[in-house]
Amino acid sequence: MTVNYQNLKLINKELEAFPRSNLLIVSKNQSQEDILELINKGYSKFGENRVQEASNKFTTSLRKKFNNINLHLIGPLQSNKTRLALNTFDTIQTLDRKKIISEISKEIKKNKNIRTSNYFIQVNIGLEEQKSGVSPDELYNVYEYACSLELKIQGIMCIPPNEPNVEKFFIKLKKLRDNLDKNLILSMGMSADYKPALKLGSNIIRIGSKIFT
């Protein structure tokens, strides 16, 4: 795959109407060469789905050379990858259970020099069995638990069902955020549905397949 700069330019143009929104380039399965090309063109915010793959591509030497890189984990976090994730990512967007929150808290106590500083709670907004995330009813309890362990919860994220009326799920996530804390960031919207997500208040859109074609 190669970077589709025409699509990238179009997305950036669309974002001009939403000054509080940012693009997170989803670079899973992409080469370090393509990532470096984007970095050299001024892009710094990337999302990866797998901890080991991200660690292999966004090496210590790369991070030292380009210290403005902001790397987000947007895939599930397994307990046995907690330490590596905390030393690889600036933000983890996929807190989906108390157990992983507890594991993160334990690692932080062992190592004060971890990289990760911000966290999002993933909400299973469509209550789909095959998807990770806390249910909407569990969100407040999990949020309070994370805060009690002094994790900095920056926002909430979702991956909605693949349905025509995706707007209703974005509206629901926004309402959940407003009831929890209006200052929290909304991470919602991907290649197929980022336009309605932006209109409904998304602060972070996660785009991969529209950029790498």
Residue ranges: model-predicted function:
Residues 203-204:
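Divalent-metal-activated hydrolytic enzyme cores
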Residues 1-184, 190-192, 200:
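Conserved alpha/beta-domain cores
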Residues 198, 209-213:
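Expand to "…catalyze enediolate/carbanion chemistry for C-C bond making/breaking, isomerization
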